Amino acid sequence: MLDVNFFDELRIGLASAEDIRNWSYGEVKKPETINYRTLKPEKDGLFCEKIFGPTRDWECYCGKYKRVRFKGIICERCGVEVTRAKVRRERMGHIELAAPVTHIWYFKGVPSRLGYLLDLAPKDLEKIIYFAAYVIVGVDEELRHNELSTLEAEMQVEKKTVADQRDADLEARAQKLEADIAELEAEGAKSDVRRKVKDGGEREMRQLRDRAQRELDRLDEIWTTFTKLSVKQLIIDELLYRELVDRYGEYFTGAMGAESIQILMQNFDLDAEAESLRETIRSGKGQKKLRALKRLKVVAAFQTNGNSPMGMVLNAVPVIPPELRPMVQLDGGRFATSDLNDLYRRVINRNNRLKRLIDLGAPEIIVNNEKRMLQESVDALFDNGRRGRPVTGPGNRPLKSLSDLLKGKQGRFRQNLLGKRVDYSGRSVIVVGPQLKLHQCGLPKLMALELFKPFVMKRLVDLNHAQNIKSAKRMVERKRVQVWDVLEEVIAEHPVLLNRAPTLHRLGIQAFEPQLVEGKAIQLHPLVCEAFNADFDGDQMAVHLPLSAEAQAEARILMLSSNNILSPASGRPLAMPRLDMVTGLFHLTRLDEGVTGELVAPTNDEAEQGVYSSPAEAQMAVDRGALSVQAQIKVRLTQQRPPRDLENELFPEGWKYGDGWTATTTLGRVLFNELLPADYPFVNEQMPKKRQATIINDLAERYPMIVVAQTVDKLKDVGFYWATRSGVTVSISDVLVPPEKPAIIEDFEAQADKIEKQYQRGALDKKERNSALVTIWQEATDKVGKAMEAHFPDSNPIPMIVKSGAAGNMTQVRSLAGMKGLVTNPKGEFIPRPIKSSFKEGLTVLEYFINTHGARKGLADTALRTADSGYLTRRLVDVSQDVIVREVDCGTERGIVTTIAEKQADGTMIRDAHVETSTYARTLAADAVDANGTVIVERGHDLGDPAIDALLEAGITTVKVRSVLTCTTGTGVCATCYGRSMATGKLVDIGEAVGIVAAQSIGEPGTQLTMRTFHQGGVAGDDITGGLPRVQELFEARVPKGKAPIADVTGRVQLEDGDRFYKITIVPDDGGEEVVYDKLSKRQRLRVFKHADGRESLLADGDHVEVGQQLMEGAADPHEVLRVMGPRQVQIHLVNEVQEVYRSQGVSIHDKHIEVIVRQMLRRVTIIDSGATEFLPGSLTERAEFESANRRVVAEGGEPAAGRPVLMGITKASLATDSWLSAASFQETTRVLTDAAINCRSDKLIGLKENVIIGKLIPAGTGINRYRNIQVQPTEEARAAAYAVPSYDDQYYSPDGFGQNTGAAVPLDDYGFSNDYR
């Protein structure tokens, strides 16, 4: 077998019959499979041992040679080579066909490659191949020309003979008629009898004339057909063809079936054809030119790559190895077989019958019919169902052909090559493990023992608990006492990977150090649930074991959960307290008035109450019941840093650990601050979830990850502790309906009745009534909600859970305790009848029914969304999988300008709302200079929160930052343009697969995006697409629904207002040609423009517009933006539009992820004029390739090619990738492979998918070349220390040391054990 690590590219091409015979180990002659009595393969059959190799290791068919010592001998009795049985997985056979057949992929694919090559319409091709028409394959022009006059004279003579014969016959008949009539007259017959005789005679004469005319016409047709005969001409009329052959057989040759195609191919001159096509393209117009371009693609492909077009017609069919189409015996003694065997059997049967017919010299019509059937059977084998009805097996199920084995989710690519199952894995239900540290998980003992079995066995032998591996295995299986101690030792510091399906982003699989636990459930740390999207209602997780030292190191360094606190999408912490923990911390940091032991100012009689010298003293007071944790106290602190302003006041030199200061706070808050790093400023406020998030964010920005991990772990422990102490529970009696509710409802019901009456009087139409009612009831719901919030006491657990941010929101509480309000119907419109009851009071039947409307739609939507979102992620991954960080800095000067703040009218700076996702975590492309010319932040600096704060203080509003959109690295991107990795907070490493991270970051929140299309007020009909469909529309670069025109030029608007349409004319400022936009529907409103002074107005006659400005409401067509504004603007447009959708759902994704995808969409150029380059006009090519070819041509003094950038949707861009392996495994497998084979495409194995498919390490992370080509040389000391170990005797390094102490895996196959040993 060839080693995948030793080749750098993989080429695919057309196999000629010669190649097929060279691969083959023998010809399959019989359709038999195995003998029903002996169950051994039949000789020369589809499973023949002589061709494919022995079925048992080292054993020939007849049993003469058994055992490995006869290796390589070919048995003289049965002809089987003595070798391993696994050669039956790799040896191929072949079938010699009695007649050539065409390959269905090249004839039936769209477009038909055979048709393009031979310039035949697919319909005609089909007639030729399936024996419905003859085709002329050769004409002897010279001979025909020379003898044309002679032949013409002969033809004239023949025609004259026919005419003379006709005249003679007519003459004779006319005389006979005259004689008959004379005779009748003599007899005195009646006139009607005479007339009948006359009519009869004339009819016969007419028939004679017609017959002669037909004969003459036939001779004319034969002659004209013959004189105009040309190669590739079809003759459908069989009689005509036979006549031609009889008369003029020596002047031409004709044929039908694949043989004729083969002859045409042999006589085909590629170079001449390519030249004539190029000429047509140069001079032609319209359809003719287009067709020539398409044909030239195919012709040029064969011309340049040494592929012979003869490969499209087969004389031999390869037979794949039998182990890949096995036959297995089922329990009942019956056999299950692969469909391929049936398909091969049909081919062999028909082929053998055809051979016999040809030997017998059967009539041509019978032979042709058999050849057609052979063609159809080979078609079914290659691609069943592509033409005509598919061949079916038992139960009318179409058989799976070779193409079907590759296609689709269940095909070879996606099922076996890209998604393999792995050994050393297990799965179980998860339960919460609150006692674990962030980097730990609880692994059930039994599961751990099974997973670590080989390690335990080795260790048992090392420790002399067992004599050999076999007895160690027995010990483990019997679970002896020593085994558990050894297991404990083996799993120490050996990380395991936990994965929860669906793995939507890279945090769906993380590494943990296992802790052995009783029971059978895996214990999971509560803080990683967010990343895994796990809960404990029966979720299951899979465990995988990294085996090699390198794998363990990667798992520990890159994948350990405590190193993955930040989200790769936004760079914000994911491992944050949630639910119970939030409630606990919120309760702990509360400040209650009027509770035990609170601070009391000194009076004349008493000293100050509630003052403590240290937190420890306060804690003692709590323990003895004299103080509440939530009471306000004064306490002296020495181990916590004071807040910033206080620190500047008290400690001008800066606070040091141990400096004392007094805080007025609660003990709970002191306890909370003890969890934070000592030098973090004291936080003296209540802690809802948002505030906790801000603090952890801040820690992640300013402290090492290990500190953050320890801090969140402490927060988790304390959160759970105080959540328990807080006694927060929810019961039905906690749901309090506000007493004011009936009055409010009554008041608004009166208003609603008024509207209803107006409607019935006809003062309002239905639409007006509905919108008025909706307004009334929305107001009512708000009022009830406010009353309810006011009515809840502070101590009530429900508002506490909501206010702390642990779960739920006030709208949900309003449904429970206030009123549900208005609900929507499936169209997304409000139903004007509100639900006036709360869930506590209970709904009426009608209310219940109305409510189910929305609820069902929600569930249906979620199901659809999940599938759509998964497919979007798949396309995104596919388009961006080869974007890998390849170098540190591409050295470009370019960048994009981002806004970090806006100046208000009064001169104050307001931080831009989107700094988080646009400027943060990027690299500066140019020095940031303030108004005085001072450099605030230098070029090349990383923009973290501190740097952005510095820029804001200096009054800078915009900065130029590096971006992947402007990166000039050839393949992939450079680290500086990408900026910092969101997940680590440092500059991205070389080898990071940023493309896949980007795809995951965009795809993962996809499920949260709404499905529905929004109804914009007043826009009926033309819905504005939102949510997931809008994201798909943008990434697929489709023309949006309800597209808005954009201004092609800068100028003044002339607006004409028609009945149903607007007409907008723009008069350009530069005096150029006017641009007219006609037939703009009035259902789409004109665009609202914001003026500098804050006014808003609709686009009006005489307004001035800038180039690229939208003229109507709706979404601009990205292709238009590209045409008018250029590639950079369309990139920024797409990024902003995608962000719009995600922001509306409150999802934070950094712009750089969207930029990575958008960059892939604009990688190609359409060639307009090829100049002196090799490119074909109209073809798509990579921008880098285009530029390098142009540079080369210009250097040689030639004419460069002209091209224009083209925006491709992600599906199209994935299929257009340079890697045929990646494209074939994505979609349209047969089409991609057909194309790749004709063009003899070579896959450079640059992306990830191609390498996964062939089984190489992926060129990302530590698999990238610059990390792989490193050799470690031990120092002298290390060497001395290693060899000082006494047990390393020389014998261990001898060849038959059986793998002892070398650390190598023992290749058991090479030792002559019989099969049963394993």
Curated annotation (Swiss-Prot):
Protein name, entry field: DNA-directed RNA polymerase subunit beta'
Gene assigned in the entry: rpoC
Binding of Mg(2+), residues: 535, 537, 539
Enzyme Commission code(s) on record: 2.7.7.6
Pfam families cross-referenced by the UniProt entry: RNA_pol_Rpb1_1, RNA_pol_Rpb1_2, RNA_pol_Rpb1_3, RNA_pol_Rpb1_4, RNA_pol_Rpb1_5
UniProt keyword annotation of Cell wall biogenesis/degradation present: no
Amino acids binding Zn(2+) 1: 60, 62, 75, 78
GO cellular component: DNA-directed RNA polymerase complex
Oligomer status and interactors: The RNAP catalytic core consists of 2 alpha, 1 beta, 1 beta' and 1 omega subunit. When a sigma factor is associated with the core the holoenzyme is formed, which can initiate transcription.
Positions annotated to bind Zn(2+) 2: 890, 967, 974, 977
Originating species: Rhodococcus erythropolis (strain PR4 / NBRC 100887)
